[in-house]
Amino acid sequence: MNKKVIFIDVDGTLTTPDGKVPSSARHAIRAARENGHIVYLCTGRSRPEIISSILEIGFDGIIGAGGGYIEVNNELVYHQTMPEDAVRQIIAYFHRYQIGYYLESNDGLFGSENCKDVIRKRITEGLPEGSEAFENADLEFHWFYQLLDSYQHKAIDYGNVNKISFISSKAHPFQEISNTFDKEFTMYRTTVAQFGSESGEIAVKGVDKYKAVEFVLDYLQISKEQSMAYGDGDNDIKMFEAVHYGIAMENATEDLKKVAKEITSKAENDGLMRSFKRHQLL
């Protein structure tokens, strides 16, 4: 058997728009591993955001925080954090302009006081206030709100922050924020589509999915020719460049589709299962 290493993004790839993992995807991953293939999560989410309903599927390892955190068989093998003084400067900047943000670390997820309100405001923009659509617009983020709440009273270790996500608006656009911090950090725009086009992430320079995938392949001593990846966002372009065969979801960005070798169906239409069957992984 030609053993494969398969890297799978989470949001919009493994999960449906409401954050659920289809039973077909669960079955496909478990069956592929039973057949001897190696399956890794490769996500922008930090460790606390990878919730139990995802972990219980069973994976051989995790690339988290967009490449800043790597776990192999439940063992931490790589972790890159932002400088503490820079984290504090960024927070002060966001407070000054009332920009919602959350710090992503292995210890927890720490949101600004206005974080949930700003997220809801972005998600409900353009919807008639009081309508059913308005009231239910952010239902898929309730798990995320609960996660933020669960760390609300925990002390923050500012030296253990993987990356910072922010939710801004046209009043203080992404490009303005990027111009302020892009000399020291890598800036990613709109990594969560529902947060709006002015939202983004601030990450350590040199940390991305390309280098993380490369690290894992080297660690496992497996060639690039045996690797595959599934994704849907622009931050998956680096992941596709690092593997032999990149497969984009139907809902993927146009830029990702341009570098993909194949397009599969959306998660809710059994995209992973269909592709796994096509590549005889089951």
Predicted region positions:
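Mg2+-dependent phosphoryl-transfer enzymes with acidic/Ser/Thr/Gly-rich catalytic loops
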Residues: 1-5, 21-22, 199-282
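Active-site phosphate-binding/coordination module
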Residues: 17-129
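Hydrophobic packing residues within well-ordered alpha-helices of enzyme cores
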Residues: 25, 50-54, 177, 256, ...
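A generic structural signal for well-ordered alpha-helical segments
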Residues: 32, 94, 178-181, 256
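Short, structured coil segments at secondary-structure junctions
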Residues: 57-58, 66, 181-183, 242-243, ...
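Short hydrophobic/aromatic-enriched beta-strand-loop microsegments
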Residues: 59-67, 186-190, 246-251, 264-266
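Conserved acidic, metal-coordinating active-site core of Asp-based
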Residues: 108-228
